[in-house]
Amino acid sequence: MLKVTLICSDKNHPVFRWLHKWKVENEHNYIINLLTCIADITSEGDLLFLVSCSEIVTKKHRDMFQQCLVLHASDLPKNRGWSPHVWSILNGENDITLSLLEAEDKVDMGRIWKKAKIKLNGTELYDEINQKLFEGELQLISWACKNLSCVTPTQQDSSAANY
């Protein structure tokens, strides 16, 4: 059975309860750990997902997993850095792109596994934006678990990067 670890740095972050729900719904398919800190990793696994994780995962910890993946709310390589979807919305964009990428030493620089677009109609409130965002993140997590053995990641074009 696939061994999946999810890390969200703060139990009070709104996405944490969504991750817990995903864990409960998928425990019959995978062995799942939901943690708040890299130091809490006690064993190797297949997939490590970093969702609203404020820590940079060292190579030592990344090497404990077949893949270490980050969920990032921007159309990478554009809008690297923390919480870019907030700035996209404030700038009047009507959608959020979620990028699923490999974790590296440098933040948001890894190869891209998959992207997903979330449409906004412009009337959503905070909780409604979060719901769409978190549902999209969970879909990407499920997709990665099902497609681990057949993914061909693509390199980011660093010349198009901004922060």
What are these regions (language model features)?
Residues 1-163:
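One-carbon transfer enzymes
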